[in-house]
Every structure is written in structure tokens, then in C-alpha cells.
Amino acid sequence: MAWRGPSRLLEGVSDSIGVPLMQINVISAEILALIFAFAYRRYLCPMKVSVFTRQLSAASLGMCLLYFVYGSECIHVFIHAGLCYTALLLAPTSIIHILTFLIAMSYLMCIHLRRVLTADLEKYPLDVSGPLMLTTLKVTIVAFGLHDGFHRKPETLIENHKRHSLRRKPSTLEYFSYIFYFQSVVAGPPSFYCDYQDFVKGENIHLPVNPQSDMEINSNDRKDGDINTELEKNSKKIHRLPPSPIKPVCLKLCETLFWICVHVFIAPRFPALLNSDPVFIASHGVVYRMGYAVISMTCCKVKYYLIWTMGDAINNASGLGFNGFTPSGKPKWDLITNIKPFELERSTSAKMFIDNWNVQTVLWFRYICYTRIPFQRTLFTFILSALWHGCFPGYYFTFLSGAFMIQAARMVRRKVRPFFLKSTSLKKFYDFLTFLLTHMALAYTGVAFNVLYFNESMIFYNNMYWWLHIAGLVAMLFLTLLPAQPRQQDDKVTKNGHTLEKVKSS
């Protein structure tokens, strides 16, 4: 049976609990992926099966999950990836990054436009554009890595570009295994190509062969690992599984359950669409509505908290996401962590928010856009973000307003913040003030992202009197008259926990 839309297998469950079918499918697919992940690490680890088997099984499971969730609509993901791989094979590496980017974004924009024109958003709040967005990340990561590896000298590359540069084109299986691996194909978070290849080949953790390291590998590791001595001789490395992910997986699953409870029992009490409802607006003043916007936008973020936290747990359960050890020797499982909710909710600046929100996508924006654009980096990155998210007018309201707000915030930080560094109490007051303003600004700009449409966005901003846009503009005009403060005052702050690089980039 070919499905035009999502799988109908769980339609009865959807009708009985009143949750859209697509959301039921996605959660079910993530639960299946979690089960597959534990089995993948246990039975398909690098020391038991070949790289070929690991790649083929990961891609096959991912394709099955896609078909379960999206039915015949998943053909768009296959076509999208196939077109980009064809370009990768046929096009010269000197232009492969630009060509792949244009193909991937053009196809994605067509699907986004179709969603705007034809989709029933109430019945299908999710569609195949989600996996296509993830595929766009992955195919462009490979293409830009190839261009950097073939056409840029290593000494001219920044560290991030050098780390992800590629010196050969991936094989068909390597490419499509990366695109479709089951841990992240439905809802993310995605990984970079080199990180995935290290994982699938068993090279994401290794120890140098020397007496000291031999002592560090206990007898159980040697027995369970069954390490190939010839590989050990040739590579001078011992490859083994990362430390057990059970603890981080359990913690992330518990956190996921917490966010599910918030999403089910609290978030529905604060619908985002109420922000542009004429009756609600007529019944409440600006201050009340601004407070409601902050609460409702926080509730809107919860669905991302739960799906990305669960996605991180799925990756970790399979062994993907191990990121070395802390100085005290504890394993880190944050290589592809995509959301840090508690750090995010304590943000005192837009930069702190961005550093903890949709982390892997932000890294992608920096990798292919922000670090490569010679001017107006923030503006072009936010425009790309709007295009990548879709064609709804609300996205463009949000990201263009966000770019403007960030420029205003940077000027305030550069010229006003030094006056508050003269005492601890002033610094705390400044942090509290920026905490409030940051969360108001995020809610104010985020309403358009969630109401989606032009008229609804205009209703909200008109009845808010565009106050934050005006405040940002006035601040920028006024602060241009003030001289910049000596940079040494920022240096004092770096000694209390912020690096100089972060201060300069914020």
C-alpha cells in the first residue's frame, strides 16, 4: 500500500487521544530508533561486524523509519539526496559546494512553498520538509568539506573548516549511510560527516599503543573487544567502544519525560495563536500581553526540548555522541547535543541563547555561511536561516527582527556594559536587566515564527506598537554618539569566566 501522506497504522491511537497523527508517528519512530540504537551498539559494534554492515544497517533502518512516518512522501528525501550525490560525482570540486547548496536549497524551498500553499497545518503540523531540512545540512556539509579539502590550503583554513575538510569523495554507501542513518533521520539532531564516519568505523575512541595505555585497558575490555591484532599493528591504535552510555541515556530520557509532561499538561494552557487574537488583545493591556507572550513562547519551545533531548539519547544509545573525557576523567556525551534547556532559560544575551538552542544547526550556519561571508555576517546568516526554515512570512519577521535586535544588543554591550563592571552589585543588576530584556526580545520576535502568517504577525506587532523595534533603533542612534569604551574593561570580565573570543563575537 502506498501512502500519500503519513502512515495510517496508528490513526486509531491518534483519534483516541486527540494528538495529530504525524506527531504520533514521529514519537513512535523515535521509540523504535531508541530500541534499534541499543541493539546497534550491542550487536553491530565495530569489533563484531564490518564497517559495510554498520553503514548498510544504519541506512536501511533509517529509510524504513522515514517510510513509516511519511509514507510515499519520503521519496522527496531520496530524490533530494540523489540529486546532490549526482552533482557531487559529476561536478568539479571547485564549484561543488555552491552547486550542492543551490540544488539542496532549491528543492527544499519548493517543498516549503508547497506546504504554505496546500498543507492542512492543523491536521499535519509536520511534513517531509523536516527530514529535507536535515538532508540539506548533511549534503552541504559534505560538499563544503570537499571544496575545502581539494581547493584550500590547510594553513588558510580556520580550525573548524580544517577539521571537516575531505580529501576524497565518499562512496555511495558512505554518503547515503550518512544521509539516512536511523539515529537522526526523522527528527535529528544531525552530526557532521567526519564525526559520523569516525563513529561508524569505530574510530570515535582510540588509545595509543604503549605500556601505559595497555594498563589502562582492563581485561574485560580485551575479552569483549576481540581486537584485531593486525589492525593494531598497522594503525598503532586500539579501537574499542566508548564508555557505557547507559547513564547519560537514562538521564536524557528522564528529562524527555519531564518535557513531555510540560508539553501535555502545561503548554496547551498558553496557545501561541492567542497573541494575535483580537478578542484577547482587546481584553488585556500591553504589559499583560507581553508577559503572556513570554510564557507562551517558552511553552512553544518545550516541544523542541523534548524531541531534541530524546534524539540526543537515541544517538548516545548507539554510541554516537561520545566526546572524550573531562579533566577529571568522566566521559562526555555532548558531541551532537542539540539543546541545553536549563542553560538556555538562564540566558542573559542573544548569544547565550543561540549557543544553547538548536546547537547543531547553528554550527552548520557558522560552517557554511557565517565564517565564509566577508561582510554583514549576522544579516546573511539570519536570512539563510529564514529560507531554510520555510516560506511562511512569520519566519522572515522573526529572523530579520532577530538580526536587528542582535546588532542593537551588541552596541549596548560594547558601550553600556563597561559602566556596570565597576562593582559586583552593578554587574548583577546588569545581568538581571539583560536577562529580562533578552527573554522579552526572544518572545517578542518569536511570536511571528509561531503564528506563521503575515496578518497575524502584523496584528501582534501593531498592537504592541512595535515598541522593541523602536527601542532598539533609538538605542542604536543614541549609542553611536557615545565613544567606545576601552577593551581592557571587557578583559576583566574574561577572567571571571568568559573567554576573550566570546566577548569579541557577542
PLM features per residue range, with description:
Residues M1-S506:
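Non-catalytic, membrane-anchoring transmembrane segments at the edges
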